[in-house]
C-alpha cells in the first residue's frame, strides 16, 4: 500500500476509472466477438450485428478506451464480412 498521500489518491482514482471503463470495454469486446462468431458461422444477420459492433466501437472511442485509428481499423476489418 502506498504511504504518500498523492499515491493513495492515485490508487483511489485508478480504481474509480477502472470500475467505470471495464464494463464499457467488455461490452465493446463482446459486440465485436459476437459479430466475428456470426461471420465465421455464415449467419445472415451480419448487417444488424455489424451495426451493433460499429456502434460499440464508436462508443469505446468516444469514451477514450481505444484510439481513433484502432476504431477505424476494427470497423474496416468487420465491414469486409458484410459485403
Curated annotation (Swiss-Prot):
<dbReference type="InterPro" id="IPR036510">
    <property type="entry name" value="Ribosomal_bS20_sf"/>
</dbReference>
<keyword id="KW-0687">Ribonucleoprotein</keyword>
<dbReference type="GO" id="GO:0005829">
    <property type="term" value="C:cytosol"/>
</dbReference>
<protein>
    <recommendedName>
        <fullName>Small ribosomal subunit protein bS20</fullName>
    </recommendedName>
</protein>
<dbReference type="InterPro" id="IPR002583">
    <property type="entry name" value="Ribosomal_bS20"/>
</dbReference>
<keyword id="KW-0694">RNA-binding</keyword>
<comment type="similarity">
    <text>Belongs to the bacterial ribosomal protein bS20 family.</text>
</comment>
<dbReference type="GO" id="GO:0006412">
    <property type="term" value="P:translation"/>
</dbReference>
<dbReference type="GO" id="GO:0015935">
    <property type="term" value="C:small ribosomal subunit"/>
</dbReference>
<dbReference type="Pfam" id="PF01649">
    <property type="entry name" value="Ribosomal_S20p"/>
</dbReference>
<dbReference type="GO" id="GO:0070181">
    <property type="term" value="F:small ribosomal subunit rRNA binding"/>
</dbReference>
<keyword id="KW-0689">Ribosomal protein</keyword>
<comment type="function">
    <text>Binds directly to 16S ribosomal RNA.</text>
</comment>
<dbReference type="GO" id="GO:0003735">
    <property type="term" value="F:structural constituent of ribosome"/>
</dbReference>
<keyword id="KW-0699">rRNA-binding</keyword>
Amino acid at each position: 500500500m502506498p504511504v504518500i498521500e498523492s499515491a493513495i489518491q492515485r490508487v483511489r482514482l485508478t480504481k474509480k476509472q477502472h470500475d467505470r471503463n471495464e464494463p464499457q470495454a467488455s461490452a465493446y469486446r463482446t459486440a465485436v466477438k459476437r459479430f466475428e462468431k456470426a461471420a465465421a458461422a455464415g449467419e445472415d444477420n451480419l448487417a444488424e450485428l455489424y451495426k451493433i459492433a460499429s456502434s460499440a466501437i464508436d462508443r469505446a472511442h468516444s469514451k477514450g478506451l481505444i484510439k481513433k485509428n484502432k476504431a477505424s481499423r476494427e470497423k474496416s476489418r468487420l465491414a469486409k464480412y458484410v459485403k
